[in-house]
């Protein structure tokens, strides 16, 4: 990292030449994050289960002349995560940024929620983020440098009246506390750990929702009256992934169109 006194303002937000891992990168927010990092000059490993989708993302990234590694990975499988991190360290030489984005959402009334659904939510949304942070953390501790950006949700602090999101909100609350605990543990090691709390954003999952009452609830509940667009999270991600946030750690950055202020 450049010395603070030598840096110009544009350098603070630069990720040029940095090496990043983005999980859940085959679609939605993860895809946007990976392409954004590449556009800004970072080398990127893209991880997800759907290899064919990752190859499509790689075609977009290749336009920017950076190194891109496609890494098939199920974040509930620790051996696959270890293999991804080992490959990234070998191919990149170091790992500067982890965008811990992979997640799933199963919405159902609590009394109807099956054990399998609960375990799937926990395995993906909590365990997967922890396993990736743990393995990447081993590399970052050797470097005495790293930026970990967990993707949580505004549902870690509020919920939506009448919507059965107990399991989902529980996992995102866990991500917030995991972020704080890791940030405190690694604060003196040059590693920052923060979490972004998106509100309702356009995604593959949201596109499948056809309940107008539900959509109306989102529009009426959000002061901006709409869902966010994936690109509207890129600024927050770049801030936390760059040296602009070098004195920021353990924080929740809400990007929710004002949902949590009312």
Model-derived regions, located:
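Substrate-binding pocket helix/loop in short-chain dehydrogenase/reductase
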Residues: 109-110, 114-122, 164, 206, ...
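A conserved structural motif in NAD(P)-dependent oxidoreductases
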Residues: 222-233, 244
């Amino acid at each position: 990292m450049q010395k603070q006194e030598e840096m110009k303002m544009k350098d603070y937000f630069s990720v040029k030449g940095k090496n990043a891992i983005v999980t859940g990168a085959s679609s939605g927010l993860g895809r946007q994050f990976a392409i954004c990092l590449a556009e800004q000059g970072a080398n990127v490993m893209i991880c997800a289960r759907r290899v064919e989708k990752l190859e499509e993302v790689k075609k977009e990234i290749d336009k920017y002349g950076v190194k891109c590694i496609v890494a098939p990975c199920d974040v509930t499988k620790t051996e696959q995560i270890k293999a991804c991190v080992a490959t990234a360290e070998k191919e990149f030489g170091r790992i500067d940024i982890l965008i811990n984005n992979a997640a799933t959402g199963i919405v159902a009334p609590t009394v109807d929620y099956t054990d399998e659904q609960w375990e799937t939510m926990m395995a993906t949304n909590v365990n997967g983020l922890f396993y990736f942070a743990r393995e990447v953390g081993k590399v970052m501790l050797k470097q005495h440098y790293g930026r970990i950006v967990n993707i949580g949700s505004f549902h870690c602090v509020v919920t939506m009246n009448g919507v059965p999101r107990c399991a989902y909100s529980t996992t995102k609350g866990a991500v917030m506390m995991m972020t704080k605990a890791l940030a405190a543990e690694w604060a003196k090691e040059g590693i920052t750990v923060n979490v972004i709390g998106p509100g309702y954003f356009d995604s593959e999952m949201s596109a499948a929702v056809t309940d107008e009452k539900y959509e109306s609830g989102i529009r009426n509940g959000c002061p901006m009256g709409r869902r966010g667009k994936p690109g509207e999270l890129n600024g927050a991600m770049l801030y936390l992934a760059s040296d602009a946030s070098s004195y920021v750690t353990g924080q929740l950055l809400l990007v929710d169109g004002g949902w949590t202020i009312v």
